[in-house]
Amino acid sequence: MNGYVFVTPCHGLTPCLLPPKQNALLFSEVACMQDELSARTEGKRLDTIPFAIGFLSVFAFIVSAIAFPEPFIRFMDLLQDKIVKDLGWASVFFSFLVMLFTFGIVCSPIGSIRIGGRDAKPDFSFFRWFAISLCSGIGIGILFWGIGEPIYHLMQPPQNLGIAPKSHEAALFAISQSAMHWSIAQYCIYAICGVAFALMAFNEHLPLSIISGLDLVMPRKHYSLAKNIVHAACLFSICCTVISSIGALIMMISSCVAYLTGLERSFAMNAIVALVATAFFVGSSTTGLKRGMNFLAAQNTRMFFIILFYIFLFGPTLFILNMGTEAFGYMLTNFIRNSTLVSTEFMSDRWADSWIIVYMGAFFAYGPPIGLYLARLGKGRTVRQFLLMNVFAPSMFVYLWINTFGSLAIYYQWKNLVDVWSFVQTQGLESTVIGILQRFPFSMALIVFFVIVTMISFVTLVDPMTSVLATISTKGISAEEEAPKFLKVLWGGNMGGVALAV
């Protein structure tokens, strides 16, 4: 056409014709972009510097904990107490800002941007997407704290609200606050990180990285230094956080196994549980997102709903419905106030330090790695769909779960059928959950089913973290590629072994 060039730009913009005089400049720019993209997406290989620093830092941290346990524990307690007291308000305040920011994006034109470009097609169905999103962030905590946390809030509500323990308002606060802790703020933090990584990876065609996009605004030498520091810090923080979670999860699962088998819980039992669990989550991670995690998350989600339906059907159904309806209204009425609860009037009251501040701090720590994992699921979806699926869908499930199990615990406590509060204080969460499930028909089958769900939930929590650690340790990896299997085995085996030792 007389030297004109027909061009279709990236990101779904309108095709256009360029005159001959701009041809040379156009092709020169395209060639530069291709060279730059090739440099960014060069073959996958170990990112040696951050990997070595992160791995050795974790090793030194764990050795210190084992060699000097008492000074180490004192130091960590002092550090945590200092952070909670001085910066707790910040974690609560900024989590609230993240929620507002998320709601704003959902309602703005930005929500119409399609991840991967206008013609991108999704890799997962809505159900599979929901299942992976739910299971990668929920872990097994809600299985036990769904009963435990509402009882704590029922018996020990925050002093600055003036709520009487065991009262009707305390029950409404217990259900609504527990649901808030496990839902909206958590998923907003994960989703905002995830959508940012997804746009960088699928729309800007950058490698999947915690600091994607900084290479566009920073000099190369500064970017390399920043990348190494940030990636090493992420590897260290993620690994240590997951190790502590794995240790707690092993103890919970061991308690359930001890009950089912009648055996006394011991180090040998913990070792067997750790070995089996590690083998499962490493195996799932090495098979990749579209196989292992895709399958396990779908089955786990179905099993979640089976348990919910069973408890709802054979439990105090009408009480659960009434409490859920009233608590939902209470949550909406007091959403802003209860999203920003900190101890002001009663400085001696450690309620906020023990609950909302700890939760928000943990969510910010888990935000980037879980967001990095969720980003891989977003191709072909709009930003609005991404946020709705990763925030509102799992939050609705969490409310159903917390209301069902929390209302059950409150009902038993009020009717003196089971002293749930005393059970939690003396026997622990695991025994409390089992004790409550014993009151249902076919209790042994229900408990076995619950333990299986607990194990799968454990796998679906640690699988994404293992994959993220391997991804951060790899150079030039895109959102549609899997990290090398040897890195997944190395990080997964290391975390499982160290968690058992600690």
What are these language model-derived features?
Residues 27, 32-168, 313:
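N-terminal alpha-helical transmembrane segments of multi-pass membrane transport
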Residues 32-45, 209-223, 249-273, 302-307, ...:
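Helix-loop-helix connectors at the membrane interface of multi-pass transporters/channels
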Residues 34-41, 74-80, 107-126, 151-176, ...:
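Flexible loop linkers connecting adjacent transmembrane helices
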Residues 36-43, 69-83, 102-123, 173-181, ...:
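Membrane-water interface regions at transmembrane-helix termini and the short interhelical loops
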Residues 43-58, 219-228, 263-282, 286, ...:
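Loop-to-transmembrane helix boundary motifs in multi-pass membrane proteins
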Residues 57-72, 95-112, 245-255, 272, ...:
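Hydrophobic alpha-helical segments and their helix-loop junctions in multi-pass secondary transporters
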Residues 95-98, 127-149, 183-202, 235-246, ...:
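Hydrophobic, membrane-embedded alpha-helices of multi-pass small-molecule transporters
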Residues 145-159, 199, 312-334, 395-427:
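Extracellular/periplasmic helix-exit of transmembrane alpha-helices
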